[in-house]
């Protein structure tokens, strides 16, 4: 099994959640393998990869607690805005960051916030990164 650091696991969590959002008929295990075996793209036969426990924790946590996460995030949107108006990558990063901030015993809230901003830097634009920082920082202060 490849060794994944926490940052790579968070990237994979984002990618799995994004994949599931885009293709809701996809099985969770298939989404994991699609993301975790990307480096085997050219291989004739793909070798399945064991899903790291922290990745499963993040993905299952976000999917199982999506309604509660959305309810917690909604008050921090601009007046008249709804989560459905947000770009999907931004919403997924917000959910992932908030879940980790509230539920991980391994990453302090400030670390989870910083990691969410790293994901935003990689998967969104500067304006979205500022928005994500503004929303999630409210939960660090709380």
Swiss-Prot record:
Keywords carried by this UniProt record? RNA-binding, Transcription, Transcription antitermination, Transcription regulation
Gene3D superfamilies tied to this protein: NusB-like (1.10.940.10)
What Pfam families is this protein classified in?
Answer: NusB
Highest taxon in the source lineage: Bacteria
Q: Which InterPro entries match?
A: NusB-like_sf, NusB_fam, NusB_RsmB_TIM44
* Sample GO molecular function, one term: RNA binding
**What are the recorded Gene Ontology BP terms?**
DNA-templated transcription termination; transcription antitermination
Claim: Transcription is one of the keywords in the record = yes
Q: Would you tell me the Gene Ontology cellular component terms?
A: cytosol
**Role summary:** Involved in transcription antitermination. Required for transcription of ribosomal RNA (rRNA) genes. Binds specifically to the boxA antiterminator sequence of the ribosomal RNA (rrn) operons.
The entry assigns this protein to a family as follows: Belongs to the NusB family.
The record's listing under NCBIfam families reads: nusB, PRK00202.1-1
- Name of the protein this chain belongs to: Transcription antitermination protein NusB
Species of the source: Latilactobacillus sakei subsp. sakei (strain 23K) (Lactobacillus sakei subsp. sakei)
